[in-house]
């Protein structure tokens, strides 16, 4: 119930910059009095003052995990390699990935597609992982596919990074990860 007025204020402070334009849906819901935790509706539905979170998607079933190759340009690469080791991944250490390896990139400020092209990686096997923050400081890991990522590679990455019980979100490629 306070979000829409704040979004309108920001939009107006930036001289109606289109990228800050609030959604018309929030204006309509606010006018109708059907938005906000107090009325039980909003981004989530609420019951007894708590958000009803959607259930986590079912983890993909993976019979055999491919070896994992991490880009030398990956942000927080050493931490990522340690995480993979802790998760029991078979880490590939060659200068370039073998043809059957899952290829991991951890871009900062770039999309997965661009990184795959610049680094000349096979986009069908390339997945991005959010590494802006230390893994211990987060409740969720975020993976990003590019338009060419194979479903078996997506599923292998999802299952691998969820091995320790931490929640994993798989998103489509975009101009940057959620926290960037």
What are these regions (language model features)?
Residues 1-180:
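N-terminal glycine-rich phosphate-binding loop for ADP-containing cofactors
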